[in-house]
Amino acid sequence: MREFERALERGEDTLVATFVLGELRKIVRESDDTQPRSDDPARLLFRSIEPFLADGSTPLRPGQIRRTSLLPVWQWLLREGAPEQAGEFEAMLGRAGDGQPSPQVDAAVRKLQLAAADAIQKITGPTAGGDKQRALSRVGSPNVVEDLLPIAALLQARDALDTLNGRLPSYLRAFGESQIASASSALNVPSLQTPLLLPFALSLVMQRLSSPWQIIRLAVKMAASDDEIRVAATPYGVAVTVALHDLSCLAASLRADIRRGHFANVAENLKTLHDGVRGLRTELDLRSDSSWRKQLTSIRAEISNALQSEIDSVPGRVRRILRQKADKDILAGARIDAGDVDEVAALIDFVAVCRTYASELAINEVTLRTYSDLQQYVEQTTEALVQSLRGGDPRARPYRQAQVSAAVRFCEVLFGRDYASLMSRAAENALTGERKSSRAS
């Protein structure tokens, strides 16, 4: 079990390690049902931190904590950080039975949270005695140590964060002047205005925004200017850093989805990226040589490169399916894979979606050219394929019918359902005419 726990601490193979560790814990619990479940106290202790947890190996931004850091911190608290308080808490949960929320449990959780925060501050503070680095290494990996101070700050400020949560609307479709003023008022709490806690408070606001990039409007409001230098000089300048980080992560996720051929979320992610890039570019006065400008340019370039390479491949994929062959080159039993047709149709739709957001994402020229070429090629080829159904070798006709079906599918994406229905009827008429001609002869 300890090896899997170490793997979680290091962030290695977290999916497999979490699953196997969970199964091992079940076996341990079944072997001694009288012992309180070791993960219940930890879950209760860190429940208030859950909105800020980040999974996976993506780089962390201000306002986030690694989920994999919680287990080592809890084990350290049990072992040496606050063993008496943690032991009392486990015993209390054992007496309570189910550990369900109650005033008694909540009071015990709050007491342990404050004790945990105090223990973390002692080991990380400048007054920590002895070999500080060795003591910190006993808590966990460098990533865990990096998360210690934020964890302590969040545990200590739980009441202030709960109050902020209660004052914020559950969802903010718009983030205009009145909403910005309301959010600013809710955030105006001294304990939340520290450099360590403010990013977490801003994250709570972001989670309620329909367009999370709009969090930069709080920074612009506080600076009373859209000038980058003035915005960066305020504590709320971190909101821009957070927005840029999230856009960068979304761009990386989009690139990974495209490489895997997963297009289900591409339209939504492209819209989010388009709106975010445009929002930061238009609502902030960014200098050409600034760090924020370079980050934004890098995000646009990453999106552009990922999209352009995929867009360039689409016409070739379409031609491989619709290319007309001589009857002698069509083998008996030749077929077109339905999965290939579905994939190419999704790619054509992908190009159409890219066209909507092309100008802001620096892919305008390639997208418009590719889409125009696809329209011209599919229109001409579909008409030619329909005509080919009127004659030719009967043995090749099933393959040509499959080509026409694929072409009609592509027409629906490019020209709409009405045009696709028109070409489908034309294909049926061509086949009917050919059958009549064959009977007459």
Language-model segment annotations:
Residues 1-389, 393, 397-398:
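Extended alpha-helical scaffold segments
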Residues 270-273, 404-407, 427:
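Short amphipathic alpha-helical coiled-coil/interface segments
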Residues 278, 285, 412-413, 419:
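Helix-capping and short linker residues that terminate individual alpha-solenoid repeat units
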Residues 280, 377, 381, 407, ...:
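TPR/TPR-like alpha-solenoid repeats
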Residues 297, 417, 421-438:
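Beta-rich interaction/scaffold domains
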Residues 362-366, 414-422:
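Structural helix-adjacent loops and short alpha-helical linkers that scaffold large soluble proteins
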